[in-house]
């Protein structure tokens, strides 16, 4: 049960935090509609798990996370979010917000499940990212980090 909870939580955290590998900003969606690809290294922080349903992973349980986002070995922001479990396998609905220094925010959502590869939708943003739309992937590295790639329109 603990291993299932840990794998599920790491998956959620990695997915949400699902979001990033060391790399560079090739481009970023800005208010003028330009798009591009952003790559981050995500450093997962301990998450909080609230067991609201049946004991152990079950529908209605909640995971909240707050993770660090790095590029080229430098912290460039963080992400916060939550996931609501829909069943005992760890399948969950997740939403989050990335804060990128003084540039603005990017919002995202994804379906979390145990596999280490997650696909997410970029649903909006603020500041330089106020017209952000697109998608991305989060790939868990198995060491408390992940690679996040966002493709913004």
Predicted regions and their residues:
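Beta-strand-enriched cores of mature, soluble protein domains
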Residues: 27-153
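Secretory targeting and sorting signals
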Residues: 1-28
């Amino acid at each position: 049960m603990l291993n299932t909870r840990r794998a599920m939580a790491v998956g959620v955290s990695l997915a949400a935090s699902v979001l990033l590998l060391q790399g560079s900003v090739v481009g970023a969606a800005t208010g003028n509609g330009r798009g591009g690809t952003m790559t981050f290294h995500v450093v997962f922080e301990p998450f909080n798990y609230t067991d609201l349903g049946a004991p152990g992973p079950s529908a209605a349980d909640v995971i909240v996370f707050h993770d660090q986002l790095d590029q080229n070995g430098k912290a460039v922001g963080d992400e916060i979010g939550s996931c609501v479990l829909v069943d005992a396998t760890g399948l969950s609905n997740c939403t989050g917000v990335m804060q990128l220094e003084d540039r603005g925010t990017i919002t995202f959502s994804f379906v979390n499940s145990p596999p280490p590869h997650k696909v997410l939708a970029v649903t909006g943003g603020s500041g330089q990212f106020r017209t952000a739309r697109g998608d991305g992937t989060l790939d868990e590295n198995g060491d408390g980090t992940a690679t996040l790639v966002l493709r913004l329109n």
